[in-house]
Amino acid sequence: MLIEQFICREDNFGVLIHDETSGYTAAIDAPESNAIQNALKRRNWTLQTIFLTHHHHDHVEALAELKQIYKAIVIGPEAEKEKISHIDQTLKPDESFLFGTHTILALSTPGHTLGALSYYFPQENLLFAGDTLFSLGCGRLFEGTPAQMLNSLKKLRQLPDETLLYCGHEYTKSNALFALTLDPYNQKLQQRAEDVFLLRAKNAMTLPVTLGQEKKNNPFLRWDNRTLRKTLRMEKETDEEVFAEIRKRKDNF
């Protein structure tokens, strides 16, 4: 499977996936029509499907135009169908389905929104997490609770280390600066942050990244880490309380 990733709007990631066997192409979300059209032209692909991670406008804004041009089928979370115009098919939480020759699991990952989905390709070890999980960060809790988001991140943390993470926004530099305030002596985090700063200085993208790296560096996947808990002075608190405190600090960072 081929993947084309690009920046659109200001900091959204656009992502196209292409099954070489069937010739099918899908977009993960629809943030900006022109950027997606240009990416399709670069690769000489035609859009058949759009997979939506959640209903926020910066992920669905281009639906009407892309449907009109390509007659693409829009597939998204059943729990958010009333909030998404132009949706054609819905997916139940944790439903599996085929894209060309590839199996996809539509993992239910509520927190950022209540119906948010993350698309996992188990054979290829690919994860498209939308705004649930970012490199060195996670999504704000616009609709869900800390408990819901923590459970979603626990689900994603169980995926194999070699899984490649793609997400909805290029937030890695600001996330790295925050992560270093909580985990300043983490050498792997220091190295990742240095790499990120160099990439962003060149206006280069910081994704994809492996989940294995994120498990070592991302504070939102390290709620049970002793060193991090000690820094927070929360050595005996529950996982949910620790996660909620990290999220609160990031909201105010």
From Swiss-Prot:
It catalyses: an S-(2-hydroxyacyl)glutathione + H2O = a 2-hydroxy carboxylate + glutathione + H(+). Disulfide bonds: none annotated. It is an enzyme of class 3 (hydrolase). Pathway: Secondary metabolite metabolism; methylglyoxal degradation; (R)-lactate from methylglyoxal: step 2/2. Binds 2 Zn(2+) ions per subunit. It comes from Bartonella henselae (strain ATCC 49882 / DSM 28221 / CCUG 30454 / Houston 1). GO terms for biological process: methylglyoxal catabolic process to D-lactate via S-lactoyl-glutathione. It comes from the Bacteria. The keyword Repeat does not apply. Its EC number is 3.1.2.6. This is Hydroxyacylglutathione hydrolase. The gene is gloB. The keyword Magnesium does not apply.
